Every structure is written in C-alpha cells, then in structure tokens.
Amino acid sequence: MHHIHKLDHPSGTAITLAEGLLAQRPDMQGWVLTDLTTPSGITEHLADAPQQALPIASIRRGEVPGIHSIEWDSDADSITITHSAHSRAGFALGAVMAAEWLPRNPGFRTMTEFMDFLFSNA
C-alpha cells in the first residue's frame, strides 16, 4: 500500500520482494499484478494469477508512505510478514547512506551490493 500520489504499480519494492521470493521458489514462474485499488477505494481485478505465478495486489490510499505484506496461506494456517513505513524519513536516510557508500566503491554498483554492505556492518 502506498500514498495516492504514487504512480507506478506495483511498486519497485513489491517487485523486488516478489523477485526475491521467486529466486527461492524454482517451482514458481513470475509474478502477476492481480488487483489494483485506486485512491477512491475502488478495487479493479486485473487478472487471475496462474497457479505457478506469484500474485501481487497494489493499493493506493491516503498519504500512506508504504506498507508491504507477504502472505503465505494454506488450508491449515496463514503467515503474514508486514513492513510499515511511518514516514518517508527512512527512504531519505537510505538514499543518503547509498550516496556516501558510492564514492568508496567506484564503478557500476547494484542495490544488492549496497544491501550486502549494510547487512555485513549491522
């Protein structure tokens, strides 16, 4: 879920999370944007996800900076992991940290390399 001013859907973070999950699940093949909830609260069903695809729903509501949830569901139970950004300050801090890291690591760099650096120094 993101604020109503965000134009892309699904968000880059949602795509990154989906690709991370798919990398661990060779039995799954890609992701599909299944539902889009507009700022007016209307949910549009865009597509059915094939059984081997990861479904993504995108919601735009109010001024929410960002909420991402991953849900596993079975007949027996459900597990949900959620990250909620309370403000945009965390996004700004991440951008500043990346900007400080880049001069010490010249060349073409990926976000994965930056995240590896962050987690190795945590």
Indicate residue ranges for each PLM-predicted region.
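C-terminal substrate-binding/catalytic lobe of Rossmann-fold NAD(P)-dependent oxidoreductases
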Residues: 1-122
